[in-house]
Curated annotation (Swiss-Prot):
Cofactor or coenzyme needed: Mg(2+)
This enzyme's EC code(s): 3.1.21.10
Identification of the protein by name: Crossover junction endodeoxyribonuclease RuvC
Localization: Cytoplasm
UniProt GO BP: DNA recombination; DNA repair
Species classification: Bacteria, Pseudomonadati, Campylobacterota, Epsilonproteobacteria, Campylobacterales
Gene: ruvC
Reaction(s) this enzyme catalyzes, per UniProt: Endonucleolytic cleavage at a junction such as a reciprocal single-stranded crossover between two homologous DNA duplexes (Holliday junction)
Gene Ontology CC entries for this record: cytoplasm; Holliday junction resolvase complex
Quaternary structure and interacting proteins, as annotated: Homodimer which binds Holliday junction (HJ) DNA. The HJ becomes 2-fold symmetrical on binding to RuvC with unstacked arms; it has a different conformation from HJ DNA in complex with RuvA. In the full resolvosome a probable DNA-RuvA(4)-RuvB(12)-RuvC(2) complex forms which resolves the HJ.
Binding-site positions, Mg(2+) 2: 66
Primary residence: cytoplasm
Cofactor detail note: Binds 2 Mg(2+) ion per subunit.
Family note: Belongs to the RuvC family.
A family per Pfam: RuvC
Length: 158
């Protein structure tokens, strides 16, 4: 089963594609949709065009996205919510339904601790996939963690 995991952001959007089969997960591709500083409308367009490219190059059985985290700055929350809304609409138009996980759910699924640091998540992602190299930046490891969380959740539901 091919799963796309997405870690939305207003500067970079991490994405990861894994193949999940009988409890074994293989990383197919991971990267960033880089969003250049510009007006919000152009940034959202850039994000959606990046997602379009991913869907043009791959087909997916499942898509999972990390929910936005709580931020203290209301402007940040509003901007992230707009990016998240655009991503949600684009995924629904191209693929259909998708799963959503909070950052705490992702951290708990990957590390066993809901309050794990991004570095701890990155360490466990590397370990769970049997990778020899570190994956940078952390937006990418977060996207992989979202995909792994969804794969684990699907195994539990089956």
């Amino acid at each position: 089963m091919k799963i796309l995991g997405i870690d939305p952001g207003s500067r970079n959007c991490g994405y990861a594609i894994i193949e999940a089969n009988k409890g074994k997960n293989i990383l197919i591709e991971a990267g960033l949709i880089k969003i250049k500083p510009n007006t919000l409308q152009y940034q959202i367009t850039e994000l959606c065009e990046g997602l379009d490219l991913i869907f043009k190059n791959h087909s997916f059985d499942e898509v999972a996205i990390e929910d936005i985290f709580f931020a203290y700055n209301p402007k940040t929350v509003l901007k992230l919510a707009q990016f998240r809304g655009a991503l949600s609409l684009k995924i629904l138009q191209i693929h259909g339904d998708f799963a959503e996980y909070t950052p705490l759910q992702v951290k708990k699924a990957v590390t066993g601790k809901a309050k794990a640091t991004k570095e701890q998540v990155a360490f466990m992602v590397k370990r769970l996939l049997g990778l020899s190299k570190d994956i940078k930046p952390l937006d990418i490891t977060d996207a992989i963690a979202v995909a792994l969380t969804h794969a684990a959740n699907l195994r539990v539901r089956v």
